[in-house]
Amino acid sequence: KDTDRSLFPDYYLQNFHHQTDGYLSDHSAGLYDLQVEILFNGTADAMRRRVLAPLKRGLKHFSDRSPSSLRVLDIATGTGRTLHQIRGALPHAELIGADLSEAYLRQANRWLNNGQSPLVQLIRANGETLPFADGGLQGATCVFLLHELPAEARQNVINEAWRVLEPGGVFVLADSVQLADSPQFHVAMDNFRRVFHEPYYRDYIADDIDARLIQAGFEAVTAETHFMTRVWSARKPAQPST
């Protein structure tokens, strides 16, 4: 059936990665993981795994709780590759994946909910307006999304992550390296933007993600570079003890 394009923000309806159907088709969803692995010379899953250690460290804030009571959201989960890795690291947590694309969620469902492991909840949602109550999640991740967004949407996603996290909750981002931390890759970044048709990448690589996290209200912001990926970890301030 045809996709109702009125459901999507304007930036989402552009061509991405030279695909005229962007993120809206099962064909695109079926190709995505192969494309990314080719692009990163087989290291994409290894770079996604870099979110696991800071996520687990951050969740130690809730170590007095049952592991099954922890709720972790993967924003823009796509085909579910990151969620699959999180499930391996946090086998008892309640995991949720949110994405705008029904086609990508179908692909994620085939990949994740195959009857061999606990089910992962997958919902269609915009990362700028997440359908969750304030403070109901203990962890959130967002992998390879920010470079696909215009600047205002980037901030909105980070603000929403702050809103849905419980005080003390952890937010882990992973995305492309940037000019400030990896100037030696300037030419590669420029070629990536042009060759792979990334309309917002030029703005992203000059953006200050640390400042955006702090603007949203996060603290304890840290960042590390691993090959072509930058990983940020931040905490929503815990409520003072009474």
Model segments located where?
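Conserved beta-strand elements of the Class I
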Residues: 71-73, 138
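A short SAM/SAH-binding and catalytic strip from SAM-dependent methyltransferases
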Residues: 138-152
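Core SAM-dependent methyltransferase catalytic element
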Residues: 216-242
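A short glycine-rich, Lys/Arg-flanked "PGG" loop and its adjoining helix->strand segment in the class I
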Residues: 155-167
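Class I SAM-dependent methyltransferase SAM/SAH-binding core
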Residues: 73-74, 79-129
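A short acidic, Gly/Pro-enriched loop at the edge of an enzyme's catalytic core
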Residues: 128-140
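C-terminal alpha-helical "lid/dimerization" subdomain adjacent to the S-adenosyl-L-methionine
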Residues: 155, 172-216, 220-226
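Conserved Class I S-adenosyl-L-methionine-dependent methyltransferase catalytic core
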Residues: 1-57
